[in-house]
Structure formats: structure tokens, C-alpha cells
Amino acid sequence: GLLDSLKNLAINAAKGAGQSVLNTLSCKLSKTC
């Protein structure tokens, strides 16, 4: 349904945001950016 679609969108957005934050943190820590 629509709610499931919205839920999946929110989950994917959260995953994407979390992934980019993790990438930024790890590159800052290892000074590779």
C-alpha cells in the first residue's frame, strides 16, 4: 500500500544519509578526503 511505500522511502533515505555520514567520518579519520 501507500504507507508501505512511504515507509520504504523513509528507510532508504535514512540508510543513504547514514551511509554518507559514515563515509565522511571514516574519510576524515583516515584523512583520505
From Swiss-Prot:
Is-annotated flag, keyword Disulfide bond?
yes
Q: Which GO terms describe its biological process?
A: defense response to bacterium
Q: Which Pfam families does the UniProt record give?
A: Antimicrobial_2
InterPro entries from the UniProt entry: Antimicrobial_frog_2
Domain of life the protein comes from: Eukaryota
Q: In which tissues is it expressed?
A: Expressed by the skin glands.
Function comment: Has antibacterial activity against the Gram-positive bacterium S.aureus ATCC 25923 (MIC=18 uM) and the Gram-negative bacterium E.coli ATCC 25726 (MIC=36 uM).
Name by which UniProt lists this protein:
Brevinin-2HSa
